[in-house]
Swiss-Prot record:
One term of GO molecular function: GTP binding
Keyword Membrane attached: no
Function of the protein: Necessary for normal cell division and for the maintenance of normal septation.
Protein name in UniProt: Probable GTP-binding protein EngB
Ligand binding (GTP): 44-51, 69-73, 86-89, 166-169, 201-203
Organism of provenance: Methanococcus maripaludis (strain DSM 14266 / JCM 13030 / NBRC 101832 / S2 / LL)
Coiled coil: none
Gene name as annotated: engB
Metal-binding keyword on record: yes
Amino acid sequence: MYENTNSEENNNNIQSQNMDIQKFKKYIRTEKKADERPKVIVMGRSNVGKSTFVKLVTGKNVRVGKKPGVTLKITEYDMGTYILVDLPGFGFMEGIEKKAQEKIKDEIIHYVEDNKDAIAASIHILDAKSFIDIVERWGNKGEVPIDLEMADFLEELELNPIFVVNKMDKIKNSEWDNHLDKVSETLGFLPPWRQWLDNFVPAIMRDNYGIDGIKHRINKRINIFKKSKK
C-alpha cells in the first residue's frame, strides 16, 4: 500500500515552522515589552556624585572615584518597572583629551534624542558650590558652560529635568535657601526655589541625604508618563 510520506514530512515541517513562528512572536513581544519600559536618565558633570547616586538607587557595586571621568560609557540598569540609564560624565575629565570629551558629549546628546519618547524622568546632578563658580567664570568670558547647555537641551526636549543639587554640605545651613535661589535662577527658574520642589532636590549623596526625595519624584514622573501613554 502506498504511503504519502512526503505529505507527512510536509505536515511536520509546517508544524515545526509554526512553532518557530510562535517562538519568534513570543520573543518579539518580550523584547517589545522590555523596550516599552520607561527610562530614567542620569546626567551631570564629571565628579558631581553621579556614580554615588546610581549606587544608592540600584544597590549595585558601581565604581565611585575621586577623579573626574569615572563613568565613560552609557550603562543601563534594570530596575524592574523602569530602566535607569547612567550617562557618562561631561565636561573636564582628567587624563581625557578634549576631542574625546566632545565625543562623549555627542554620544549623550544622540542617546537622549534617540530615546526621548521613552524617557519618563531626567536627573541632572549638580555640584552645589562649583556649579555657580563655573557659570560665573564662563560668563566672565562671554561663554556658556556645558552644564547650562545640557539643562537647556533637556528643556528643549520637554523632559522637565529634576535638578539634584548635590554636596550641599559645602554650603552653610543658614545660606541654603539663598544659594538654592541662585541655582534655580541661574537655570531659568524664578526664585524662590521652593516653588519648584518638583524640579529641585538639595542633596548630600555621601550621607544619603535627599535620596528619598529623588526617588519620590522619579516615581511621580513615571506614573505621569505611563498615564500619558494610555
